[in-house]
Amino acid sequence: MITDVQLAIFSNVLGVFLFLLVVAYHYINANTGKSIIKSK
């Protein structure tokens, strides 16, 4: 069985990964938007 500690570590790692994925998505999306506006 999965212990409470293993579940806590898994959920924390998953939360950090999803948070970084959202930050990376917004960073890439903001940069591409600026470059498209500058190129016009």
Swiss-Prot record:
Subcellular location: Endoplasmic reticulum membrane
Topological domains annotated Lumenal: 1-4
Listed name of the protein: Dolichyl-diphosphooligosaccharide--protein glycosyltransferase subunit 4
Record's function text: Subunit of the oligosaccharyl transferase (OST) complex that catalyzes the initial transfer of a defined glycan (Glc(3)Man(9)GlcNAc(2) in eukaryotes) from the lipid carrier dolichol-pyrophosphate to an asparagine residue within an Asn-X-Ser/Thr consensus motif in nascent polypeptide chains, the first step in protein N-glycosylation. N-glycosylation occurs cotranslationally and the complex associates with the Sec61 complex at the channel-forming translocon complex that mediates protein translocation across the endoplasmic reticulum (ER). All subunits are required for a maximal enzyme activity.
Domain of life of the organism encoding this protein: Eukaryota
Residue ranges crossing the lipid bilayer per the database entry: 5-25
Protein family per UniProt: Belongs to the OST4 family.
Record InterPro entries: Oligosaccaryltransferase, OST4, Ost4p_sf
SUPFAM superfamilies per UniProt: Oligosaccharyltransferase subunit ost4p
